[in-house]
A protein has these predicted regions:
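Short, charged low-complexity linear segments at domain edges
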Residues: 76-97, 139-146
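Amphipathic alpha-helical packing elements
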Residues: 98-106, 110, 118-121, 215-216, ...
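C-terminal accessory/binding modules appended to enzymatic or scaffolding proteins
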Residues: 88-98, 102-107, 178-179, 184-187
Length: 543
């Protein structure tokens, strides 16, 4: 059978473009590779490409990298690592990886992506919002602003500008992303702490009938909150503007309630203040806009505190609103299973309340759910699919779940799911909090599961019951031999909770357990845990 000759590469580069024939051939081959490389064609090496395009690398563009060089496991992808350390590890890497390093590394989904995908979207300019990383806050948005500038003429700007192809906006079904929320109905809340607790934690129930949403255990639930009315009124008073001032087709009060963030004051607000004031106040506002801290109070300046810091200004309400960040949704781990609670979703939420300079501050969504919502209220919501946080495909596999505080949320869902499907695998839960008499979340449920044998083991840690603080990682070390035995039986390990301390300490404890009871060196133990991660047998949902 005769074979037809291989067709040439299609022409992506117009003949009028300022390239030599060799350069045009190479670029056409490059784009052919991007859009589907023809069978049997070997791409040029970076060295050969540099010979064809000698001016490209000389003009400051980063050299091409192999897939292995571009994706080296992201050593900065550690939520406990400070920003300067992450950026140092990413130094010299391609710009998208440095953008990734600037993020909070939690893969929490509040931005609508995981960290790597958000960075990639910023790099290709299909996403232009630099303030979506809620846990990273102003520190992340400032660093992203610096890095994003490189796309438009900085050190990593391309030497040759090629017209951008119009970006396609990915469609997401209703309720499947922050950009396309649906409505669900608030049903109830129940306090999980007993009287005398220093914490305020709520079990929240939401009806999904109107939304038509479903979810899997391990997923998270996004909610668009509203700012506290007292805070909104305080801002209106400090601004000296009427609440019914028109902002587009809404009022100023409405926009302040659910349209903009009144939490940490953004740099743009201080920049606006610097434009309309003078003298020392202008200098301070300009310094704050540049990320400096002239009076040592920058960390405590929410929008109302910023207005109080510069009293007497009469800002145009529209300009004021333009200077604020949009109010972001908040994402919570789902603590229920549709198989045991059809048509409903439950959340486990710590209400955040604290005082700064004799004024109460409130967690915008936690106190919205934990105090201001009433049964029947309609909420804008969406399901955030899990990024590699799910039960084993084999229900016979044992699972070890480590979730102190609200970190218990996904594991309550796991337990209900495994109970509903009659999974034969063993279940071991580590839970901890401050005091056993006040902070034992879901005590009756867990006690019943333990009595029935569904919860094979329940290990508890209380940090305030004795003089010595006991945390889950301490309990892990006490039963390290048994953990090692479960691992040898194929157990999957899950961690949920605080990224800065707990998750790091738990991983350290697990490495030590492997070294001690597995009879290996610390380096080998680290490799063992890394292998668990690579195989999906060690998964974390941290915040």
């Amino acid at each position: 059978m005769s074979m037809s000759p291989r067709p040439p590469f299609p022409s992506f580069i117009p003949e009028s473009a300022p390239f030599t024939p060799e350069q045009r051939t190479w670029l056409n081959g490059l784009f052919a590779g991007v859009f589907g490389l023809q069978e049997g064609v070997t791409p040029l090496s970076p060295a050969d490409a540099a010979k064809l395009l000698p001016g490209l690398l000389d003009a400051g563009a980063a050299p091409a990298t192999t897939p292995t060089e571009a994706d080296d496991g992201a050593p900065w992808h550690d939520p406990a690592m400070p920003m300067p350390d992450r950026m140092k590890l990413a130094d010299g890497r391609p710009l998208p990886r440095r953008m990734m390093a600037a993020m909070a590394q939690q893969d929490c989904g509040q931005c609508g992506y995981n960290c790597k995908d958000y960075a990639d979207k910023l790099f290709d300019k299909s996403e232009k919002r630099l303030n979506l990383c809620v846990p990273g806050g102003k520190e992340t948005s400032r660093m992203l602003k610096q890095l994003y500038a490189e796309l438009d003429g900085g050190a990593s700007a391309p030497a040759v500008e090629i017209a951008e192809e119009p970006k396609r906006v990915a469609y997401s079904p209703p309720g499947r992303s922050r950009d396309n929320p649906v409505y669900a109905t608030f049903l109830s809340r129940q306090r999980l702490n007993k009287e005398g607790s220093e914490k305020e934690t709520w079990h929240i129930e939401i009806d999904l009938a109107e939304s038509g949403l479903d979810y899997e255990v391990g997923d998270s639930f996004g909610i668009f909150p509203a700012n506290a009315p007292s805070l909104v009124e305080g801002v209106l008073e400090a601004l000296g503007a009427p609440g019914d001032f028109p902002i587009g087709d809404r009022t100023l009060r409405e926009v302040l309630t659910d349209g903009v963030s009144l939490s940490p004051a953004p740099d743009m607000l201080f920049q606006l203040v610097s434009y309309i004031t003078g003298g020392e106040r202008k200098a301070k506002a300009k310094a704050l806009a540049e990320g400096k801290d002239p009076d040592g109070d920058a960390a405590s300046l929410d929008v109302l505190a910023a207005l109080h810091k510069f009293p007497g200004l009469r800002m145009d309400p529209e300009a004021f609103i333009e200077a604020l960040d949009p109010l972001q949704p908040r994402v919570y781990s789902i603590s229920s299973s549709l198989k045991s609670s059809p048509g409903r979703v439950t959340l486990t939420v710590d209400a955040v309340r604290y005082e700064v300079d004799k004024r109460m501050r409130y967690g915008v969504c936690s106190t919205f759910l934990g105090g201001r919502c009433s049964p029947g209220d309609r909420l804008r919501v969406y399901v955030q699919k899990a990024h590699g946080f799910a039960l084993p495909a084999d229900p016979a596999k044992p699972v070890i779940m480590i979730g102190p505080g609200t970190g218990i949320a996904p594991f309550r869902a796991f337990l209900h799911e495994r109970q509903a499907i009659k999974a034969p695998g063993r279940n071991w839960l580590f839970f901890g909090h401050q005091r056993s008499n006040h902070d034992f979340f879901y005590e009756e449920e867990l006690t019943a599961m333990r009595a029935s044998g569904h919860l094979t083991r329940l290990t508890l840690a209380w940090s305030r019951d004795a003089n010595e603080k006991i945390y889950v990682q301490h309990r892990m070390r006490e039963v390290g031999r048994d953990i090692w035995a479960w691992l040898n039986d194929g157990a999957h390990v899950y961690v949920c909770g605080d990224a800065q301390r707990m998750a790091k300490d738990v991983e350290t404890a697990l490495v030590d357990i492997v070294a001690q009871h597995g009879g290996c060196t610390p380096a080998q133990a680290k490799d063992f845990v890394a292998d668990l991660k690579a195989k999906g047998r060690y998964q974390a949902d941290v915040y």
